[in-house]
């Protein structure tokens, strides 16, 4: 313990020497990350051996120390690679080689010379966003060689060039759609308007969505001084509207370019009005024809059903002989009674009548009859979802609510219950649906806790709960019991 504290104090003193010296060489920055790695290794070792404090420094969890140690190793290797490049002799400060600067946009690059870019959306000075751009950017190309380029800004965003390809790390068009309504934005650097308002998003007439990585299109570029003292570069949007997708709006009918404030469609002529009137008349005539056909079919169906019911009733009354099915004197079709071996319609039996009555009662949404199917005892407590009250009677809802979710109630020391919950989750048995936090009962007259702490374990069915009880390994002093809830 004493040796560990002594080594930790030595590392702290060496780090303080680097901070106070303020050296700006790459060798010092590599040494700084090396000491940070050793510091995290000591903290990891201390926490592994249940040491919670080194001197005045609290020891973090092992996962935190492990993550920071890996980050320090990665930065140390990256700086060693940069040291072998032609840029290893330049000035490098602690800020330039910090992890935050390295991961800031553009990520995985070293940057120098930050400056701010102000973007105003919708022409509202209050709707302003500040971005950070960089003058010098160091990155590794596809050949694993370090390159140094100048950061640049245009109407689309901040970027740097990897060969001839622009690599944008800030895009204004995306935020123009997010923070603005009209899609216009204005770019300012050092309180000077560099780019005039640019329309970044308009609804395309074709209804198609294009690539969001393309840059806005402008047909003309005018460099004229504005009323202010700053010189502005104005990108005209009268001839082509730049969208958030970076393409001009196209007409859906002719396929030609159509400006945002372009000419509208011509007013309707007399010929077009007459064509519209003819189409209206045709649609009305079709509607009337459909209605007449529908009414005719309904009347025919009703007449057929009435004639069928009359013939059935007459056939059931006769015990034999021939029975005519039409009202006129000339018999057309006869049905033989049972006495002569012919066929006749069967009279409704009590079984079929009861089935029809049962179906009729169910269709009305009422309660099931006394002979309906209930719920078996082994199914009680098998439902987890809350029962809906729609389309259920009182008896139907009672049967549905009989399937309550089963639970197990644990009683014991709160810390022991928490440790058991943690270990049981690690086992990942897949039997427990939910674990509750530890809780306690309180009295009616005060807030004093009564008895030991409790914790609930819910299950999807009684079978899963039974399986869990067979393999359950409770700590000493923990009691358990079964239970059910109306809903969780």
Curated annotation (Swiss-Prot):
The keyword DNA-binding applies. Residues 278-291, 301-311, 332-346 have a biased composition (Basic residues). Its main location: host cell. Residues 196-215 have a biased composition (Polar residues). Transmembrane segments: none annotated. One of its GO terms (biological process) is DNA replication. GO terms for molecular function: DNA binding; DNA-binding transcription factor activity; nucleotide binding. Plays a role in the initiation of viral DNA replication. A dimer of E2 interacts with a dimer of E1 in order to improve specificity of E1 DNA binding activity. Once the complex recognizes and binds DNA at specific sites, the E2 dimer is removed from DNA. E2 also regulates viral transcription through binding to the E2RE response element (5'-ACCNNNNNNGGT-3') present in multiple copies in the regulatory regions of the viral genome. Activates or represses transcription depending on E2RE's position with regards to proximal promoter elements including the TATA-box. The gene is E2. It comes from the Viruses. Pfam families: PPV_E2_C, PPV_E2_N. Keywords: Activator, DNA replication, DNA-binding, Early protein, Host nucleus, Phosphoprotein, Repressor, Transcription, Transcription regulation. GO terms for cellular component: host cell nucleus. Phosphorylated. Binds DNA as homodimer. Interacts with protein E1; this interaction greatly increases E1 DNA-binding activity. Interacts with protein L1; this interaction enhances E2-dependent replication and transcription activation. Interacts with protein L2; this interaction inhibits E2 transcriptional activity but not DNA replication function E2. Interacts with protein E7; this interaction inhibits E7 oncogenic activity. Interacts with host TAF1; this interaction modulates E2-dependent transcriptional regulation. Interacts with host BRD4; this interaction mediates E2 transcriptional activation function. Residues 404-488 are annotated as: DNA-binding domain. Residues 224-245, 312-328 have a biased composition (Low complexity). This is Regulatory protein E2.
């Amino acid at each position: 313990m004493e040796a560990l504290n002594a080594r930790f104090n030595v590392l702290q003193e060496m780090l303080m020497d680097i901070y106070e010296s303020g050296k700006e060489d790459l060798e010092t920055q590599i040494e700084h990350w090396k000491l940070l790695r050793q510091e995290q290794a000591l903290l990891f070792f201390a926490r592994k051996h249940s040491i919670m404090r080194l001197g005045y420094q609290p020891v973090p969890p092992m996962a935190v120390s492990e993550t920071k140690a890996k980050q320090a190793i990665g930065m140390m290797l990256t700086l060693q690679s940069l040291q072998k490049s032609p840029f290893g002799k330049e000035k490098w400060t602690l800020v330039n080689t910090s992890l935050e600067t390295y991961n800031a946009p553009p990520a995985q690059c070293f940057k120098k010379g930050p400056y701010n870019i102000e973007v105003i959306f919708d022409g509202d000075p209050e709707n302003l966003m500040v971005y950070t751009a960089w003058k010098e950017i160091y990155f590794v190309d596809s050949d694993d060689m370090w390159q140094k380029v100048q950061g640049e800004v245009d109407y689309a965003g901040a970027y740097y060039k990897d060969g001839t390809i622009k690599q944008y790390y800030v895009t204004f068009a995306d935020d123009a759609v997010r923070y603005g309504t009209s899609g216009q934005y204005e770019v300012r650097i050092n309180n000077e308007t560099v780019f005039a308002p640019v329309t970044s998003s308009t609804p395309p007439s074709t209804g198609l969505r294009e690539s969001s990585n393309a840059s806005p299109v402008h047909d003309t570029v005018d460099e004229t001084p504005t009323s202010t003292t700053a010189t502005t570069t104005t990108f005209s949007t009268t001839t082509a509207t730049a969208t958030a997708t970076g393409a001009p709006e196209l007409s859906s009918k002719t396929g030609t370019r159509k400006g945002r404030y372009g000419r509208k469609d011509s007013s309707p002529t007399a010929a077009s009005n007459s064509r519209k009137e003819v189409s209206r008349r045709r649609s009305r005539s079709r509607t009337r024809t459909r209605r007449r056909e529908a009414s005719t079919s309904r009347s025919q169906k009703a007449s057929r059903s009435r004639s069928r019911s009359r013939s059935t009733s007459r056939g059931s009354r006769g015990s034999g002989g021939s029975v005519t099915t039409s009202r006129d004197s000339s018999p057309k079709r006869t049905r033989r009674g049972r006495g002569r071996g012919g066929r006749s319609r069967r009279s409704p039996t009590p079984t079929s009548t009861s089935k029809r009555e049962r179906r009729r009662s169910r269709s009305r949404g009422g309660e099931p009859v006394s002979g309906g199917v209930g719920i078996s005892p082994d199914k009680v407590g098998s439902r987890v979802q809350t029962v809906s009250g729609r389309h259920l009677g009182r008896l139907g809802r009672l049967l549905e609510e009989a399937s309550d979710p089963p639970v197990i109630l644990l009683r014991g020391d709160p810390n022991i219950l928490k440790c058991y919950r943690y270990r049981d989750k690690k086992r990942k048995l897949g039997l427990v649906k939910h674990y509750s936090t530890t809780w306690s009962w309180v009295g009616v007259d005060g807030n004093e806790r009564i008895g030991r702490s409790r914790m609930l374990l819910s299950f999807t069915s009684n079978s899963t709960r039974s399986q869990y009880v067979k393999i359950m390994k409770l700590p000493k002093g923990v009691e358990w019991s079964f239970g059910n809830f109306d809903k969780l």
